[in-house]
UniProtKB/Swiss-Prot annotation:
GO cellular component, one term: fungal-type cell wall
UniProt main location, coarse: secreted
Protein EC: 3.2.1.58
Protein species of origin: Candida albicans (strain SC5314 / ATCC MYA-2876) (Yeast)
Subcellular location: Secreted, Cell wall; Cytoplasm
InterPro entries: Beta-glucan_modifiers, Glyco_hydro_17, Glycoside_hydrolase_SF
One GO BP annotation of this record: fungal-type cell wall organization
Family: Belongs to the glycosyl hydrolase 17 family.
Catalyzed reactions: Successive hydrolysis of beta-D-glucose units from the non-reducing ends of (1->3)-beta-D-glucans, releasing alpha-glucose
Name by which UniProt lists this protein: Glucan 1,3-beta-glucosidase BGL2
């Protein structure tokens, strides 16, 4: 079974690069729940830049994210996978207004991609057709926005992010077709996997999503990212999934490092713990503990990939 899986995976990944890129999902709030300012973001990015120079976010207007993070990212030489929240009309209008106000203040090279929605299909916030419409609306919007040097943002791809299992469902096709690039999220923890099965499950999820997207786009030569994956270091168990530093370290090596070795780009969830987050019913405190680093920037486990 494992040999068949690896053979199929190799077929799917025939055209990818030798080593996948690494990015980090980055929270926009301090431990006390207040919003990070430019200097705080600069501190975060200065700390992260020896590990990656790509970060991913979820919204533009919330916490003045683009207003504060954009200049910090440009100053530190980072690219942003910029999330845009599309789920309700008022929020979406605020997102578009923020794009129009703050994209002209930075360079187009600072934005790696616009990502419209984060698991909007998985949560059933939008239908695939509704999400496709929002993606196309952002494409039209950014074509008319120029950066601080007069360059158009039309060169920046516009995509979306959703859970792997939703992407392999045929109902997601309108959104996949509209998106220039699609990121796939996969968490073995939320699938109640034991540690022994966690990395295998992650690979299987990623393979299914990638194969679906390659088929939809009619090519194996597509840009592809795992938009979120990781393992919590504290909180309650979820089925056979047990949060711990040891298990997170194991999933980093056998899951994240291994995916990158196959040429898969991975945006890890997440850079730093977020102590401000509330407990979630049934998974007490787990949302606070997904960071590779504690909120004070103490590393929890080695993130050097060991390919031995």
């Amino acid at each position: 079974m494992q040999i068949k899986f690896l053979t199929t995976l190799a077929t799917v990944l025939t055209s990818v690069a030798a080593m996948g890129d690494l990015a980090f999902n980055l929270g926009v709030k301090n431990d006390d729940g207040t919003c990070k300012d430019v200097s705080t973001f600069e501190g975060d990015l200065d700390f992260l830049k020896s590990h990656s120079k790509i970060i991913k976010t979820y919204a533009v207007s919330d916490c003045n994210t683009l207003q504060n993070l954009g200049p910090a990212a440009e100053a530190e030489g980072f690219q942003i996978q910029l999330g845009i929240w599309p789920n309700d009309d008022a929020h979406f209008e605020a997102e578009k207004e923020a794009l129009q106000n703050y994209l002209p203040k930075i360079s187009v090279s600072t934005i790696k991609i616009f990502l419209v929605g984060s698991e909007a299909l998985y949560r059933e916030d939008l239908t695939a057709s509704e999400l496709a419409s929002k993606i196309n609306e952002i494409k039209d919007l950014v074509k008319g926005i120029k950066d601080k040097n007069g360059k158009s943002y039309s060169s920046v791809p516009v995509g979306t992010v959703d859970s792997w299992n939703v992407l392999v469902d045929g109902a997601s096709k309108p959104a996949i077709d509209a998106a220039d690039v699609v990121y796939s999220n996969s968490f073995s923890y939320w699938q109640k996997n034991s540690q022994a099965n966690a990395s295998y499950s992650l690979f299987d999820d990623v393979m299914q999503a990638l194969q679906t997207l390659q088929t939809a786009k009619g090519s194996t030569d597509i840009e592809f990212w795992v938009g979120e994956t990781g393992w919590p270091t504290d909180g309650s168990s979820y089925g056979d999934s047990v949060p711990s530093v040891e298990n997170a370290a194991d999933q980093w090596q056998k899951g994240i490092c291994a995916l990158r070795a196959w040429g898969i780009n991975v945006a890890v969830y997440e850079a730093f713990d977020e102590a401000w987050k509330p407990d979630t019913s049934g998974t007490s405190s787990v949302e606070k503990h997904w960071g590779v680093w504690q909120s004070d920037k103490t590393l929890k486990y080695s993130i050097d990939c060991k390919f031995n």
